[in-house]
């Protein structure tokens, strides 16, 4: 039930900037049609104070580091996590942290940190190389698949081994209505926790999904269901959100 005035979860936009230029980006390239900037630690501290002060008797609190690309402001992410943990001890709270990333800046140091501090990590990739490179180019127009795929595999493997949550987050558009093939592609790469969702866009955009696309979309979901059920209970099982 809704409790008036109670806040137990927060999406913290630590970066209004991004190093990709995804065609369908709801944030207009990460800056939400505003000046490119990153959140200061002082603002992040105020956000943590706010959620603690407004959480009532809730013990378990959640913060999702988001953007833009949050790893462009990684130092503030780390400082905010430490501050939240310190404050949580004072007030008898427990924080769970999630970070959503386009995976470009991931390296061994960052991956180790995420495995230590993040309850969940959301890894953005849209599917097969030709699909991802079309929908998620870099700022200079080049494809991003080759920049991120090894990073994604490394994160997934390490978190699988540690029993930690992650999931692959893909977006399908008019250009890949056969998105069940992208889910199969993820599986073939060793990825087991998967999600794909439809783009939300104005119908005038060439990638927008329209009513006429629904039969093909339903066919893809039917095929995806068959694939899922075939592998359920076997060593080829995967989770789909």
Regions of interest found by a model, annotated:
Residues 11-13, 62-66, 98-102, 122-126, ...:
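A cross-family glycoside hydrolase active-site/sugar-binding cleft signature
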Residues 30-31, 70-72, 103-108, 120-142, ...:
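Conserved radical SAM core fold
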Residues 40, 44, 77, 148, ...:
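Aromatic/hydrophobic pocket-lining residues that form the small-molecule binding cavity
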Residues 46, 50, 83, 147, ...:
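Short, conserved SAM-binding segment of the class I
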